């Protein structure tokens, strides 16, 4: 990876005619440290927002220990730099194979779901594991949003209560 002291130096040397992907590690470290100091909870980075290996490595170096992953490939990306990082498989539609691989090969115990079918799939793919941490995504009203995604993500209110009851029977937390 080429390194430049500034964007101006990059432009002068490369004279790019296409977009250039730049990583400012010091900015990532600074933002991560600031957020971790100010946020009272646990910080979980969504790998899909920037799956670049240098970004993940820099975040781990800054002390981020938890990652929201949406695929086995994202789990591998995190584990390449930290075997102890906690990965939470938060994609709500996963294949049985990816659930099984995540659980049995990588030790992933945290999964998100928003349907009974997804819960059944998780239970079958983990051999009805007793050490799971399951999250139910609930759809909330987005009536004032520019783009209403409330019908795309999460269990609707009328189904969520029953789903919570089912999850409670199978979840560690």
Mark where each language-model region is.
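A charged N-terminal "starter" segment
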Residues: 1-111, 116-132, 169
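Conserved anion-binding
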Residues: 105, 114-173
